[in-house]
C-alpha cells in the first residue's frame, strides 16, 4: 500500500492553542502530510509524518514515524483531526514522495511567525497570515499547499476549478507574501472530492 494523506489538526484546550484558534478564527491550528508505504508481504513499512512547526528544533521541522506521532500527539490520540487521502494516479506515489522529501530537505520553518504577526496587531485573519520574504522558509500550511499544488499541476491539469484555486493561493503569496492558514486550506479544498478522498 502506498498512499499520501493530509491531516488537519484541531487545537486543544490549552491556553496557547486557544489563542491560536481565536486568532485564526478556526478550529484548525496545524496541518501535516502523512506518507504511508507498506509492503505487508515482506513486513516492511515506511510511514512518515512531515511537520513544520516552531517547536521542532533549530530548523522548525520534523519527520516523525507515523506510529510515534499517533501515540504522542494529543489531537491524534483524541481523534479530533480531519484526515483526507490525497488522490494520486496509480504508479505516481514515488514522484510525489520525492517532491515531499526534497521540499522537507530544502525548506525550514519560518520562526519569525509569531502569534502577534497573525492579522493586524493580533486581530484574527482567518484566510492568510504574514509570510516570509526568504523563499527557503515556510509554515505547515504553506508546505501542505505546495504538495497539493504539485499534485494538481501534474495530475489534475484538466480540472479548471482546482487549478484556479491553486493559482489564486499561489498568486496571493507572490503578491502579498502571505501564507494560507490551515483552516482556509481546509475550506478551499475539502469539497474537491476528486482530490480529497
Model-found features: residue ranges?
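Structural alpha-beta junctions
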Residues: 27-30, 106-107, 153
Amino acid at each position: 500500500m502506498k498512499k499520501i494523506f493530509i491531516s488537519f489538526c484541531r487545537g486543544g484546550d490549552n491556553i496557547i492553542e486557544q489563542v491560536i484558534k481565536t486568532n485564526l478564527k478556526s478550529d484548525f491550528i496545524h496541518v501535516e502530510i502523512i506518507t504511508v508505504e507498506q509492503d505487508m508481504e515482506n513486513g516492511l513499512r515506511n510511514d512518515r509524518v512531515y511537520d513544520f512547526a516552531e517547536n521542532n528544533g533549530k530548523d522548525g521541522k520534523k519527520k516523525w514515524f507515523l506510529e510515534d506521532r499517533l501515540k504522542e500527539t494529543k489531537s491524534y490520540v483524541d481523534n479530533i483531526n480531519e484526515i483526507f487521502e490525497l488522490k494520486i494516479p496509480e504508479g505516481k506515489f514515488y514522484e510525489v514522495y520525492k517532491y515531499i522529501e526534497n521540499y522537507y530537505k530544502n525548506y525550514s520553518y519560518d520562526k519569525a511567525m509569531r502569534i502577534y504577526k497573525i492579522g493586524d496587531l493580533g486581530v484574527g485573519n482567518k484566510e492568510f497570515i504574514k509570510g516570509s520574504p526568504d523563499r527557503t522558509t515556510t509554515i505547515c500550511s504553506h508546505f501542505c499547499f505546495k504538495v497539493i499544488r504539485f499534485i494538481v499541476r501534474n495530475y489534475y491539469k484538466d480540472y479548471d476549478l482546482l487549478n484556479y484555486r491553486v493559482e489564486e493561493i499561489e498568486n496571493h503569496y507572490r503578491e502579498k507574501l502571505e501564507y494560507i492558514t490551515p483552516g482556509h486550506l481546509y475550506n478551499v479544498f475539502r469539497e474537491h472530492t476528486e482530490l480529497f478522498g
